[in-house]
Swiss-Prot record:
Protein name: Transcription elongation factor S-II
GO terms, molecular function: RNA polymerase II complex binding; RNA polymerase II complex recruiting activity; RNA polymerase II transcription regulatory region sequence-specific DNA binding; zinc ion binding
Composition bias, Polar residues: 103-120
TFIIS N-terminal domain mapped to chain residues: 5-79
Length: 309
């Protein structure tokens, strides 16, 4: 199945997204006939489109999509390992150092230069001698004839292209999909403030040096344009920051509960930090009714807090 055939199926999936029967039929065809490669996945964005049905309310569809995505990832990883093994074998083959430019494998009886083989193995990567951006990549981002949308598209392209090995058309396709979804959710003509706010959320998180995985996930389709256009800002945060946000939220909840609930002071509890016995506490039902109450304690001497059930 070539890229043209795959693109037809991608378009049909988009057109028939509300028709479960049609979606299932298309997915089954892709599952049986589509052989995934990094190049095909980038050119067609079939992974992005299929991934949209991962949370379908139709159990058969969601189950099939999860199976397909897992199978495709395995195939890509296997192909990568095979290429790496082949490269390792070539690099360590006897006589390789003597004639790297002329010795190669025979394809249809024609001897291929080793340099050609290396280029072929890197065909999925885009290498530029200049810093990656729309200007240096020769990409026209002024496609909407709308000042704000064109500016946002250019900014998205530039931030996604920076230090990327994905080809320009693939990055442009991703940037267009993100901007289009942003404008669909918050039309820039009728809700400019929300449109700009969403752009700032996406841009600041993608460009952040503390969040290197985000751009990779967007480029590979693991994070979809639909998700980017609607998610909370904290959903894009790196794992350490997410954990800190959760800890702060828990602490705020603890403080809020302690401020509104009457506390009792007792000497029954001992502070594990300062060993004082002047402890205030309150109890809440934080789980199901048949579970024991949770006791929230605060040491009146040092302020140490703990809880137990």
């Amino acid at each position: 199945m070539d890229s043209k055939e795959v693109l037809v199926h991608v378009k049909n999936l988009e057109k028939n997204k509300s028709n479960d029967a049609a979606v299932l039929e298309i997915l089954h065809v892709l599952d049986k006939e589509f052989v995934p490669t990094e190049k095909l996945l980038r050119e067609t964005k079939v992974g992005v489109e299929v991934n949209k049905f991962k949370k379908s309310t139709n159990v058969e569809i969601s189950k099939l999509v999860k199976k397909m995505i897992s199978s495709w990832k395995d195939a890509i990883n296997k192909n990568k390992r095979s290429r790496q093994a082949q490269q390792h074998h070539q690099d360590h083959a006897p006589g390789n150092a003597e004639d790297k430019t002329t010795v190669g494998e025979s394809v249809n009886g024609v001897q291929q230069p080793a340099s050609s083989q290396s280029d072929a193995m890197k065909q999925d990567k885009y290498v530029s001698t200049k810093p990656r951006n729309s200007k240096n990549d020769g990409v026209d981002t002024a496609i909407y004839h709308h000042k704000l949308r064109d500016q946002v598209l250019k900014a998205l392209y530039d931030v996604l292209a920076k230090e990327s090995e994905h080809p320009p058309q693939s990055i442009l396709h991703t940037a267009k999909a993100i901007e289009s979804e942003m404008n669909k959710v918050n039309n820039c003509d009728t809700n400019e403030a929300a449109y700009k706010a969403r752009y700032r959320i996406i841009y600041s998180n993608v460009i952040s040096k503390n969040n290197p995985d985000l751009k990779h996930k967007i480029a590979n389709g693991d994070i979809t344009p639909e998700f980017l256009a609607t998610c909370d800002a904290k959903d894009l945060a790196p794992a350490p920051l997410k954990q800190k946000i959760e800890e702060i939220a828990k602490q705020n909840l603890y403080n809020a509960q302690g401020a509104t609930i009457e506390r009792s002071v007792t000497d029954r509890f001992t502070c594990g930090k300062c060993k004082e016995k002047k402890v205030s506490y309150y109890q809440l039902q934080t789980r199901s009714a048949d579970e024991p109450l949770t006791t929230f304690c605060t040491c009146e001497a040092c302020g140490n807090r703990w809880k137990f059930s």
